[in-house]
Amino acid sequence: SPTLDDEHNDNFVRL
């Protein structure tokens, strides 16, 4: 699931 989480991001890249 796409989540805006810093620890757990599947479809989001950690900036």
UniProtKB/Swiss-Prot annotation:
Superkingdom of origin: Eukaryota
Record flagged with keyword tRNA processing: no
Localization per Swiss-Prot or TrEMBL: Secreted
A GO biological-process term: neuropeptide signaling pathway
GO CC annotations on file: extracellular region
UniProtKB keywords: Neuropeptide, Secreted
Coarse class of the protein's main subcellular location: secreted
Protein function: FMRFamides and FMRFamide-like peptides are neuropeptides.
Similarity comment text for this entry: Belongs to the FARP (FMRF amide related peptide) family.
Record-given protein name: Extended FMRFamide-12
Organism: Austrophasma rawsonvillense (Gladiator)
